[in-house]
Amino acid sequence: MSVGVWAVIPAAGRGVRFGSPVPKQYLPVVGRPLIVYTLEALAAHPAVCGLMVVVAEGDLAWSGWTELAGKPLLTCSGGVTRAASVLSGLLALPQVVHADDFVLVHDAARPNVALSDLERLLEAGCAHPVGAILAVPVRDTLKRAGSDGSIDGTEPRERLWRAFTPQLFRRSQLVRGLQVAAADGIEMTDEAMVMERQGLRPLLVECAESNFKITTPDDLVRFEFELARRV
């Protein structure tokens, strides 16, 4: 595709669920910080023309990179929530990124997105009136639990998907939706939710299961295995 996009990568989280004293995006993987793999995966696509990494205020672990694969790599300070950090990143984008331009938002701890999946997201999302997200259909059987921990019932899974990233939307629509949600005190857990709240219906683009997020130590082991397979 010929349309150039910037990517916003919220990386201000502390990784509390991971249980490490080091934020998980900076954990060493084969001698390099995890976030480097994420940034390289995005920068590898020719349509990605710049990266905005949103770091925590006073982040001492960030190495101060300003360029990756010949593309500008900028930083700004994030907020206390993921949504606040995404909003900060969107507002800090350079002037070359216009209000109606599409922007990618991608988790810092999701380092294994395939170039082919990114290509399909950009092709489908930029042709869609709203935008699109990478996602995976739910394939497991889902059970609804009662308050006592027993099974209350089985949920139909035919139309359920697991939302992944990157997610691709127009900058102005995301900014507006995030600002309104913040004013209303509503937590937005992903960008698609922001669009849904505006009455918009983003497109689902199926991607590989290997585009998983590093949330637990087991996930990190899995990513190391994926890296070994590349050799």
Curated annotation (Swiss-Prot):
Site (Transition state stabilizer): 17, 24
GO-annotated molecular function: 2-C-methyl-D-erythritol 4-phosphate cytidylyltransferase activity
Site residues by UniProt (Positions MEP for the nucleophilic attack): 157, 213
GO biological process: isopentenyl diphosphate biosynthetic process, methylerythritol 4-phosphate pathway
Domain of life: Bacteria
Catalytically driven reaction(s): 2-C-methyl-D-erythritol 4-phosphate + CTP + H(+) = 4-CDP-2-C-methyl-D-erythritol + diphosphate
Class of this enzyme: transferase
Pathway: Isoprenoid biosynthesis; isopentenyl diphosphate biosynthesis via DXP pathway; isopentenyl diphosphate from 1-deoxy-D-xylulose 5-phosphate: step 2/6
Keyword annotations: Isoprene biosynthesis, Nucleotidyltransferase, Transferase
InterPro entries tied to this protein: IspD (IPR001228), IspD/TarI (IPR034683), IspD/TarI_cytidylyltransf_bact (IPR050088), ISPD_synthase_CS (IPR018294), Nucleotide-diphossugar_trans (IPR029044)
The protein's Enzyme Commission number: 2.7.7.60
Membership in a protein family: Belongs to the IspD/TarI cytidylyltransferase family. IspD subfamily.
Function of the molecule: Catalyzes the formation of 4-diphosphocytidyl-2-C-methyl-D-erythritol from CTP and 2-C-methyl-D-erythritol 4-phosphate (MEP).
Protein name listed in UniProt: 2-C-methyl-D-erythritol 4-phosphate cytidylyltransferase
This protein's encoding gene: ispD
